[in-house]
């Protein structure tokens, strides 16, 4: 599949303070996410940043938050980002066809987001070297 940047949107999923220290390969994932985010910014791809229950899990980790602070942030209480009404409206308002997805935890929130986006008619690109979970088997 070829990605046209004019048709693409980036969805960052739950890379948050209180969860991130417990995931596998966190240093490598953080480095990869920084590289991905910087590259997508150069290409002017719009971003949506999602955070699961900020009161309990915290905000996006500082190294990434610094890079994405100007983009919309949406708090969610569902596993899927695409079950949150504000996120759905924001994604639909962009008229983008392709959603690039990265974040944590791969087997829950990232997976549910991808499945719901596919069901919603979007093409999904999962950046696997920018996804992780607490257990290696779930990554």
Predicted region positions:
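Short acidic, Gly/Ser-rich segments with clustered Asp/Glu that frequently serve as metal-coordination loops
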Residues: 17-22
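Active-site alpha/beta core segments
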Residues: 23-26, 30-112
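A short glycine-rich beta-strand->turn/loop micro-motif centered on a GG-aromatic cluster
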Residues: 100-103, 123-136
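A cross-domain feature marking catalytic cores of carbohydrate-active enzymes
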Residues: 15, 49-52, 128
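Short amphipathic alpha-helices and their capping/turn segments at secondary-structure boundaries
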Residues: 1-4
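N-terminal nucleotide-binding beta1-loop-alpha1 segment
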Residues: 8-15
């Amino acid at each position: 599949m070829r990605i046209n940047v004019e048709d693409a949107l980036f969805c960052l999923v739950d890379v948050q303070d209180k969860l991130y220290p417990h995931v596998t390969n966190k240093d490598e994932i953080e480095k990869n996410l920084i590289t991905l985010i910087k590259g997508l910014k150069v290409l002017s791809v719009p971003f949506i940043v999602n955070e699961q229950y900020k009161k309990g899990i915290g905000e996006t980790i500082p190294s990434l938050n610094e890079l994405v602070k100007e983009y919309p942030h949406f708090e969610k209480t569902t596993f899927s980002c695409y079950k949150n009404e504000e996120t759905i409206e924001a994604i639909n308002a962009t008229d983008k066809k392709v959603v690039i997805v990265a974040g944590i935890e791969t087997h829950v929130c990232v997976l549910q987001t991808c499945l719901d986006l596919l069901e919603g008619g979007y093409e999904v690109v999962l950046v696997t070297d920018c996804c992780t979970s607490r257990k290696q088997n779930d990554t």
